[in-house]
Amino acid sequence: MKKVLSVASEAVPLIKTGGLADVVGALPAALAGQGWQMRVLIPAYRGVLAQLGKVKQVWGDPDLFGGPARVVLGKCGGVEVMALDAPHLYDRAGGPYSGPDGDFWDNAERFAALSWAAAAIARDGAGGWQPDVVHAHDWQAALAPAYLRYWGVQIPTVLTIHNMAF
C-alpha cells in the first residue's frame, strides 16, 4: 500500500476558509479505495487539537523557526491527521491566515515551518511511518518539495495549486 503525506493549511472538518479544505478533507477517503494510505498534515491552530481527541506525539523539534514544535497523530472522521503543534506560530486568535488586525505578518515563516516539518517527516519518518509520496497543497505547503530536493531526498512530490487567485 502506497503511503501519501498530504500537506495543507486547512482540511475539513478541522479548519476551513475555502475549497482547499474540502479537497484536502475528502481526498484520503477517495484514495483509500484505490489502495492508498493517506495522512494529512495541518497546523495545530487554536482548537484543532481538541477536535482530534486522543493524540500521540510522533515527531518533534526543539527549535522550529524560533520555538518548540511537535507533530501529533490523531483521527478525525476516520482520517489520520498529523497536526503541527507550534504554539509560537499557530496558537492565535482569528483564522488560519489573519486575526482581528488583518493578515499575520509572519505567514511566510509560519507556512515555511509547516513545509519544513513535512519534509523532515518524509525524510526521517514519524512514529514508524514514512510516506512514499508528499502531496503539497497550495503556496502554504509549496516549500516541502523544495526542502526535500535541497536535502537530496529522492521521494516523489506533487504540488497542487487549487486557486491561482491566492
Model-derived segments and spans:
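Catalytic cores of nucleotide-sugar-dependent glycosyltransferases that transfer UDP/GDP/TDP-activated
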Residues: M1-F166
